[in-house]
């Protein structure tokens, strides 16, 4: 199948909200051009999007079909290779970070994963950001990642 180029992946996700991704984000950028914090966060996100590596085509196909369309993971029907993936078997510490504004992995989709794992050492945190903002924004650098780092440190 080959690789899925990052431009195609970005296109697939951007058509979920075409006006927001194609026009509105640039209008917001121009309206906030004097806000250094906003511009810094915007540029970090754009850089992250621009540096997305290609994804193996078969992996992309299985991910879209199995996770998005058929919801196999939460239904306890997912396999990786020949191995069954059961969330009930996950008994290690789990830190579930949910982006409230995520249009790719909505809170309604990510929160059930948190409750499906059998771990007794788990935490669920909601953040007022979007999908990419969880990793590639000023908010992420100042809040999301430090909280995750502290949580990991406490368990190492």
Named regions from a protein language model:
Residues 1-58:
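Alpha/beta-hydrolase-fold enzymes
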């Amino acid at each position: 199948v080959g690789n899925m180029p990052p431009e195609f992946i970005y296109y697939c996700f951007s058509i979920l909200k075409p006006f927001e991704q194609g026009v509105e984000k640039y209008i917001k950028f121009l309206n906030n051009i004097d806000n250094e914090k906003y511009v810094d966060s915007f540029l970090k996100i754009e850089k992250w999007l621009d540096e997305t590596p290609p994804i193996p085509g078969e992996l992309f196909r299985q991910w879209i079909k199995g996770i998005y369309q058929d919801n196999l993971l939460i239904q306890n029907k997912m396999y990786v290779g020949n191995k069954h993936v059961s969330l009930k078997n996950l008994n290690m510490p789990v830190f579930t970070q949910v982006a409230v504004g995520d249009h790719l992995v909505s809170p309604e989709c990510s929160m059930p994963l948190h409750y499906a794992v059998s771990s007794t050492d788990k935490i669920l945190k909601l953040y007022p950001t979007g999908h990419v903002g969880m990793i590639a924004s000023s908010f992420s650098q100042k809040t999301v990642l430090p909280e995750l780092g502290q949580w990991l440190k406490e368990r190492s």
